[in-house]
Amino acid sequence: MVRKEMHPLDLFKFCPKCGAPAFVENCEKSKRCTACGFVYYFNVSSATVAFILNERGELLVCRRAKEPAKGTLDLAGGFVDRVETGEEGVAREVFEETGLEVVETQYLFSLPNTYLYAGFLVHTLDQFFVCRVKDYAGLRAMDDVADSFWAPLEKENPEEFGLNSVREGVKRFLKEYK
């Protein structure tokens, strides 16, 4: 049996502009209100992921404190806020999750992902950055991170990372940038 993934717009029953219950499928990417004519296009959410290496070439790895993938390995990062650039978003997320201050970012690549939040499948475009931090003294697990630690790159097993895009990103980083 082939299981079709639910489209995120399936949960939207009312027009976000006028509130009418006349919000119908317009095409694969949008819904249209038959009452006011408003068309809403579904777009992905922007997220960031940080590769942070210390002076010994070890990677900063975090353990997820919350679902999805609670207890699995992760890298610092998260959703980009409404008026942030990717660089600003990754710096803020690194600080919120680890206490480390990012002083330089270098964009590497992006990967699509899905993130199940409160039963709602959020589609994301995850931007991967190499980040240099001011110093390593303030490292601590905060926000949605249960633990953070330095791990030798040669001992990293991408399969231990719980989120698909992070797992694939770690594989790519180890292959292309090591």
What kind of region is each of these model predictions?
Residues 109-137:
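Active-site-adjacent beta-strand/loop module that shapes the phosphate/pyrophosphate-binding cleft
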Residues 23-24, 41:
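Short functional micro-motifs and their immediate structural scaffolds
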Residues 15-18, 33-36:
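Short cysteine-rich clusters marking metal-coordination/redox-active sites
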Residues 140-170:
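NUDIX/MutT-family hydrolases
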Residues 2-5, 54-96:
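Conserved Nudix-box catalytic region and its N-terminal flanking loop in Nudix hydrolases
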